[in-house]
């Protein structure tokens, strides 16, 4: 599995700010969007471009243009919504698919409860958004669903991940790509990432 941990100073600085315990909801949202934008910049590095001729201010000009790559952005509800605006800054014409998966707090097993996928998703590259890759179960369930629908070109964008979750994802879906800001230390006995960010969904939406 292709794993890209982005160590750029801007990424690491913004991630560090997100780890502050008493960060405001507003600031957490802003940083989540900013980091997602930076992750998208790297994750789209392999998009094909073509040369086209346009009419410029002083005649015809050759320019580079992305070559018809169809993308669907797939935020995992609900925390993935906090990453969506940052991603769409770079791919504003991407179609949006929604997948809802929650993790049972006792068994830690993923439970899908909703999905709405774009048509002809088999022709698109899916960019799955989930800020926290902990046990990997939620992302694995999402990729299972996408592949069942015929989509096999899948990139996952996460802010932080635990080694255990990465290993589980790689075992089940070695053909996906993972882009993230940090591979953290471990999971605790409750399945939370250490040091992690806390509950990203609660911090994005201001709930407890």
From Swiss-Prot:
Keyword Iron-sulfur tagged: no
Residue positions binding 5-phospho-alpha-D-ribose 1-diphosphate = 78, 103, 130-138, 199
What keywords are assigned to this protein? Allosteric enzyme, Glycosyltransferase, GTP-binding, Magnesium, Nucleotide-binding, Transferase
Instruction: Name the reaction it catalyses.
Output: UMP + diphosphate = 5-phospho-alpha-D-ribose 1-diphosphate + uracil
Q: Which cofactor does it need?
A: Mg(2+)
Q: In which pathway does it act?
A: Pyrimidine metabolism; UMP biosynthesis via salvage pathway; UMP from uracil: step 1/1
Q: Which parts of the sequence bind uracil?
A: 193, 198-200
Matching entries from InterPro entries are given as: PRibTrfase_dom, PRTase-like, Upp_B, UPRTase/APRTase, Ura_phspho_trans
EC number(s) reported in the record: 2.4.2.9
What molecular functions are annotated in GO for this chain? GTP binding; magnesium ion binding; uracil phosphoribosyltransferase activity
A Pfam cross-reference name? UPRTase
Q: Where are the transmembrane segments?
A: none
Q: How is its activity regulated?
A: Allosterically activated by GTP.
Q: Which GO terms describe its biological process?
A: UMP salvage; uracil salvage
Q: How is the cofactor bound?
A: Binds 1 Mg(2+) ion per subunit. The magnesium is bound as Mg-PRPP.
Q: What class of enzyme is it?
A: transferase
- What is the role of the protein in this entry? Catalyzes the conversion of uracil and 5-phospho-alpha-D-ribose 1-diphosphate (PRPP) to UMP and diphosphate.
Family affiliation:
Belongs to the UPRTase family.
Kindly provide the name given to this protein in its UniProt entry: Uracil phosphoribosyltransferase
Q: Which organism is it from?
A: Blochmanniella floridana
């Amino acid at each position: 599995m292709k794993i890209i941990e982005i160590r750029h100073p801007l990424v690491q600085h913004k991630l560090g700010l997100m780890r502050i315990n008493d960060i405001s909801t507003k600031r957490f949202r802003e940083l989540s969007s900013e980091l997602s934008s930076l992750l998208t910049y790297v994750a789209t590095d392999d998009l094909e471009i073509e040369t086209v001729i346009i009419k410029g201010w002083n005649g015809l000009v050759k320019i580079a243009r992305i070559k018809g790559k169809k993308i669907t952005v797939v935020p995992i509800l609900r925390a993935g919504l906090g990453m969506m605006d940052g991603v769409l800054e770079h791919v504003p014409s991407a179609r949006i698919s929604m997948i809802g998966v929650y993790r049972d707090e006792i068994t830690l097993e993923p439970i899908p409860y909703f999905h709405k996928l774009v048509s002809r998703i088999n022709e698109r590259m899916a960019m799955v958004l989930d800020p926290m890759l902990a046990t990997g179960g939620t992302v694995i369930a999402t990729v299972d669903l996408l592949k069942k629908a015929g989509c096999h070109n899948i990139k996952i964008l996460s802010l932080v991940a635990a080694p255990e979750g990465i290993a589980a994802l790689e075992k089940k879906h070695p053909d996906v790509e993972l882009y993230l800001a940090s591979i953290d230390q471990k999971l605790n006995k409750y399945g939370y990432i250490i040091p992690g960010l806390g509950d990203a969904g609660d911090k994005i939406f201001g709930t407890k």
